[in-house]
Amino acid sequence: MGTPNDQAVLQAIFNPDTPFGDVVGLDLEEAEEGDEDGVFPQAQLEHSKALELQGVRAAEAGDLHTALEKFGQAISLLPDRASAYNNRAQARRLQGDVAGALEDLERAVTLSGGRGRAARQSFVQSGLLARFQGRDDDARRDFEKAARLGSPFARRQLVLLNPYAALCNRMLADMMGQLRAPSNGR
């Protein structure tokens, strides 16, 4: 029958337009995420979220200095909240500080207990950094964790990292090309 990952590869090859969630067993659902922020005082939480939003907007506008400043303020306000570390990691990566980004991602995973939205995003970012550095085994491990936490992007990355899927995709593309453009002898 094959593993759920094998089934996901075949699903992606033969039915590329269907969502990966259709593969039985691939959605290894985590227990209810719950409210990750419920443990923080409401006023501080709202201020921290506002600072993060300002940081995200600054990063989107290309002002990484301000973004890092806002994320740092959010971290100072609630140092045990994973989300700001995850956001700061993204800004650090954009600034070229890969080591700093990885430190923040590790911290976010630790604070989140490896569960919830912040952990899922951290595993995706860590997987992307590993992939960009050519560390495909590390990328695969991080994407597997993110996929278990519900990330469809991580699932797609896992399929792309599978060498058998790459070979099958190449063979299928060649075969489809031959079917669309038959040789002159026919």
Curated annotation (Swiss-Prot):
Spans through the membrane: none
Pfam families: TPR_8
Record-linked SMART domains: TPR (SM00028)
Keywords: Repeat, TPR repeat
Coiled-coil ranges per UniProt: none
An annotated GO BP: negative regulation of protein polyubiquitination
Statement: the UniProt record of this protein carries the keyword Repeat: yes
TPR repeat placement: 48-81, 83-115, 120-153
Similarity comment text for this entry: Belongs to the TTC36 family.
Protein name: Tetratricopeptide repeat protein 36
Species in which this protein is naturally found: Mus musculus (Mouse)
